[in-house]
Curated annotation (Swiss-Prot):
Residues 430-481 are annotated as: Disordered. Its EC number is 5.2.1.8. Residues 462-471 have a biased composition (Basic residues). SUPFAM superfamilies: FKBP-like, Triger factor/SurA peptide-binding domain-like, Trigger factor ribosome-binding domain. GO terms for biological process: 'de novo' cotranslational protein folding; cell division; chaperone-mediated protein folding; protein transport; protein unfolding. The lineage of its organism: Bacteria, Bacillati, Cyanobacteriota, Cyanophyceae, Synechococcales. Residues 174-261 form the PPIase FKBP-type domain. PANTHER family: TRIGGER FACTOR CHAPERONE AND PEPTIDYL-PROLYL CIS/TRANS ISOMERASE, TRIGGER FACTOR-LIKE PROTEIN TIG, CHLOROPLASTIC. It is found in: Cytoplasm. One of its GO terms (cellular component) is cytoplasm. Consists of 3 domains; the N-terminus binds the ribosome, the middle domain has PPIase activity, while the C-terminus has intrinsic chaperone activity on its own. This is Trigger factor. It is an enzyme of class 5 (isomerase). Keywords: Cell cycle, Cell division, Chaperone, Cytoplasm, Isomerase, Rotamase.
Length: 481
């Protein structure tokens, strides 16, 4: 029976869903039943009969009429759904769902009689924008901070420092203490899991250990022992330790410090590809200025995209949301794996459920941003020229010449997505108004993270400008705004 003979009626449902009602003619329901009997006859093993030679009456008696009808109906539903999609050119997302139960449909199914099958499926959303031009947004401008040049130089000096033993004085801030310690909870005296070590190097810097630990070691002499009272922060990774008071019995076994290299041309050559300290300073300054501009541009784009999303009208299908949630969870798992963590043991079913639940708002926001840009491209007829795409592809492939396991089609799509997004965001900047807003007050957590961030920036001093090829490889699945 050809798909053209089916009568198909579609009805839109909320949440970007579509109800598809298919009128199945009597001859097709009969054909499905006959095919089911033939299939079962070929697969069933009955004593005294060869496969495919079981008489119909015996087959029905042995298997039961209900099982044969159910087998026929399953096949019929699958085939009419496939034909209806092709006939109506419906782009379904995921698997369809019967309107009602299979058992209810089975009760109405009589081979040789017409049947109506109604199914629902998610379909691709149809995003529209109420407005595209004249949008208004506020964005923070990131200013170049000259003091960060000195911070980066200091961090680089620390990385290139020579560690030497300390003699004749007590531990000071910035030293490296070799300590043995044993931690117990103050409330019940139980040992802290992972809270003991026979010998461990500890940088005596604020934020390296839980509050109170480093401060307790400062002032100790080699060979000293003392008990230090600490309190685990409320955001400590181990939930059962959060906010609990603890005592650490500490022994200072050895003490070392760093001898920093002189800040001169020799240091510049060792720390970077520059020949002089002046050149290194100039290079770091330019990097910081470029970074400030990139961050400012990113802030403008984020603000404009948020303004565009406010103009978006769309219903997100649940299947798309769930797929994006899974993508986010997989990204999290990948990040943990790169850090050497055992993802299989860490990602328990409960943790995965919690991650999926907490990731849903971000997943929905990412979908809205993506669909808003899609709608903008369609509304303003913006696209990427083949010449621009091919030129960028040639550039990226040249940078990836030594890389393996790169899917050419995925790479092409990633480059196309990046170029289109760049074009769309540029168009938004030209056709919208972005005003500068005052920087938000810096939180204590952000302040505490500054040394680590400065260290990360300083580590780049010895490396040439980050390769765009690596970015293209890392983003080979999709362009992220």
């Amino acid at each position: 029976m050809s798909a053209a003979s089916l009568k198909v009626t579609t009805t839109s449902r909320p949440g970007s869903r579509l109800a598809v009602e298919v009128a199945v003619p009597a001859e097709r329901s009969q054909a499905s039943y006959e095919e089911a009997i033939t299939r079962l006859s070929r697969s069933v093993n009955l004593p005294g009969f060869r496969k495919g030679k079981v008489p119909r009456t015996v087959l029905v008696q042995q298997l039961g009429a209900l099982r044969i009808r159910a087998t026929a109906l399953e096949s019929l539903v699958e085939s009419v759904w496939r034909d209806a999609l092709a006939q109506e050119t419906i782009e379904a997302l995921g698997q369809p769902e019967l309107s009602g139960s299979f058992e209810e449909l089975l009760d109405t199914f009589k081979p040789g009689e017409a049947l109506t099958v109604t199914m629902e499926t998610d379909v691709a959303p149809s995003p529209t924008l109420k407005s595209t031009k004249g949008l208004k947004a506020e964005a923070e401008t990131v200013a170049f901070d000259a003091a960060k040049v000195d911070e980066m130089l200091e961090q680089s000096r620390r990385q290139l420092a020579t560690v030497v033993p300390v003699e004749g004085r007590k531990a000071e801030q910035g030293d490296i203490a070799v300590v043995g310690f044993k931690g117990t909870y103050s409330d019940d005296g139980s040992e802290i899991e992972g809270g003991s070590a026979d010998s461990m190097d500890v940088d005596l810097e604020h934020g390296r250990m839980i509050p109170g630990f480093v401060e307790g070691v400062v002032g100790m002499a080699v060979g000293d022992s003392k008990t230090v009272d600490c309190t685990f922060p409320e955001d400590y990774p181990k939930e059962d330790a959060r906010g609990r008071k603890a005592s650490f019995a500490i022994e200072l076994k050895d003490l070392k410090t760093r001898e920093l290299p002189e800040l001169d041309d020799a240091f510049a050559k060792q720390a970077s590809e520059q020949e002089t300290l002046a050149e290194l300073r100039s290079d770091l300054e330019q990097r910081l200025k470029d970074d400030a501009e990139r961050r400012s541009r990113s802030n403008r784009h984020d603000a404009l995209l948020a303004a565009l999303v406010e103009q978006l009208e769309v219903e997100l299908p649940e299947s798309l949301i769930q797929q994006e949630v899974r993508n986010l969870v997989e990204q999290t798992a990948g990040q943990f794996a790169q850090q050497g963590m055992d993802v299989q043991s860490l990602f328990t079913p409960e943790l995965v459920r919690n991650l999926m639940e907490s990731s849903r708002p971000e997943a929905e926001e990412r979908l809205r941003r993506s669909l808003a840009l899609t709608a903008l491209a369609e509304s303003e007829k913006l696209s990427v020229d083949d010449a621009d795409l091919n030129a960028k592809l040639k550039e990226v492939k040249g940078q990836l010449s030594g890389e393996r396991d790169i899917d050419p089609e995925r790479l092409r799509q990633a480059v196309l997505d990046d170029l289109l997004q760049e074009k769309l965001l540029g168009w938004l900047e030209e056709n919208s108004t972005v005003t500068e807003k005052a920087p938000e007050a810096e939180s204590d957590a952000a302040k505490a993270s500054k040394p680590a961030a400065a260290k990360k920036d300083a580590s780049k001093a010895k490396t040439a400008k980050t390769s765009k090829a690596k970015t293209a490889k890392a983003e080979s699945e999709s362009a992220e705004s």
